[in-house]
Amino acid sequence: MRLCTYSVEPGAPRLGAECGGAVLDLARYSHLHDGLRLPADMLGLIDAGPDAWRHATELCRRFSAELPTHDLAQDAEAGLAYPADRVRRHAPIVRPRKDVIGLGQNYSAHAKELKNAVPPAPIYFTKPPTAVIGTDEPIPYPQGLTTRFDWEVELGVVIGVGGRNIVQARALDHVFGYTVFNDVSARDLQFRTSQWFKGKSLDGTCPMGPVIVTADEVADPQALRLTLTVNGVRKQDGHTRDMIFSVAQIIADLSAGMTLEPGDAISTGTPEGVGDGRTPPEYLKPGDIVEAEVEQIGVLRNPVR
């Protein structure tokens, strides 16, 4: 499934699924067709567990099969489904319950471009829920706080089944789905001390989306191309096979002695091509359009304002 959080004015954000050219309201469609009501938000669906995920998948298949005979205008009037271009997309998890966990320098070429040694163990930091925004939302330029405002396209992982001391061989069984993150970073704040948190945590510096693609549709998270453009010019072009620590290794390492919970989000690091590693350096400025893309997931687009 390609799951999103959408809204239609003046309504509040709700859980949806992309089906063809439509966005299906899973909770309403489920209630109408089988008397059950799936949760109306992403975290609720994640918490509901694998049986609910399978039910949602079956609803999407049913709706997709019926779509050629549907009157989408009538569906929209009933609040069941909408043409994709009629809805606003939010971050798939509008307000994470906890900080997003980030990885630093998880691609060797990226570590080298920042003149750092390849790390012997994963480097973790976090980004607070207040940093999370969705596709097409503006990234606020922090005037007066930074002159080195940088981009980072990353594969995002959302945990579906919690656990502690998860073994690497079973780690991917704990994944709910995958998304795109842009780990926007204020480099001068990031590197003023050895602790990166402030430079990674400014409001609006964790764009996420446009969807979460469920794990059953991504055969291998280490087989995905990542790209990023600024104003249509390609800046990053990498591949998840080049991660130093794979998704499975990250989950196993993180969960060693530390419980991962459903809904936890992990941003797995960026390939080379960031602005701070260029000669001369390049940085984001107001008016720029940033598009971060991960193969099989989609394009996360944000203006800088």
Name what the model sees in each region.
Residues 1-122, 291:
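N-terminal non-catalytic cap/leader segment that marks the start of a structured domain
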Residues 4, 89-92, 112-115, 140-149, ...:
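A generic local secondary-structure boundary/capping motif
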Residues 7, 105, 127-129, 136, ...:
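Short, structured patches in soluble enzyme cores that scaffold and shape functional sites
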Residues 8-10, 18-22, 159-161, 230-232, ...:
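Short acidic-glycine loop/turn motifs at beta-strand connectors
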Residues 13, 57, 68, 82, ...:
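Catalytic-pocket segment enriched in acidic/His residues
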Residues 17-18, 117-135, 151, 285-296:
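Structural signature of FAD isoalloxazine-binding scaffolds in flavoprotein oxidoreductases
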Residues 102, 150-152, 261, 285-286:
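Residue-level recognition of short, solvent-exposed, well-ordered loop/turn junctions
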Residues 123-142, 161-164, 204-211, 271-275:
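Short catalytic-site patches enriched in acidic/histidine residues
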